């Protein structure tokens, strides 16, 4: 009997030891991009109900957080400050209250944001105020403060979930000077995305050694030279030519995309773009298998999800009802 008891204890210890060494971590990554002021499911320009909006996006996020909890990572890829009159009102009319967009994104618990060209277009007074009100970092590795030569915004964010280290590198299309007057972005410059990605990938690998590397790029898919010198829409170029990215989240061009590409090192990279106005979102499942604390395998799958299929978040609408009513009065 003693022998059987010893064997049982030994087997139990063995099973527990194996269980402690092996682990599966599941992450849900949700990307919004080019929301363009569509905070409510109502178009204040046409005075009609709207199929997109942060209110619909949050209905999806609420549902998914029931399962994933802190393992849901919510990211925005820029161009959120301009498009609907509600955004204009808090950009230029009510400049004393906390910016509505920042309040909404804080309420939704975004983990990181990114700058878009239309966010820059609002002017430094507006976008700096919005950034300073956000409870999460707004990224911009290639937005450089001319006086210091350093990024004006955090270049990347480091997160850890269930022992998995995640790094998100944010960049914007460098073609801002081709569209926007310098008085809107005075004191800044916008560096080439591929050059910036190479620089920061080296730093990130040496300093952070991430298990999952995400690019959050406000740039589209088909690269071309704008005004003869700016590499516009370089997201795919970076995904293919700069090894190290597992996922590249795209925006800016309002074109839906979800596919895998192979980079120059022979590794697969998921590239995904949810187009605009909060009508669809990037919905990514990542499964990582760890052994002895190290990632042994990664499975990454992405789809574009229609937000209309999840209804409207009642909690969101209730929380921001006063601002909605105010918008109806003043717009």
State where each predicted segment sits.
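Phosphate-proximal small/polar/acidic motifs at interfaces that engage nucleotide phosphates
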Residues: 14, 319-324
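Bacterial Sec-dependent N-terminal signal peptides
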Residues: 1-23
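Acidic, Ser/Thr/Pro-rich beta/coil linker or hinge segments at domain junctions
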Residues: 307-315
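Intrinsically disordered, low-complexity N-terminal regions enriched in serine/proline/glycine
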Residues: 3-7, 109, 323
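Conserved small/polar residues in nucleotide/adenosyl-binding loops
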Residues: 329-331
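Generic hydrophobic, helix-prone segments enriched in Leu/Val/Ile
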Residues: 90, 323-326
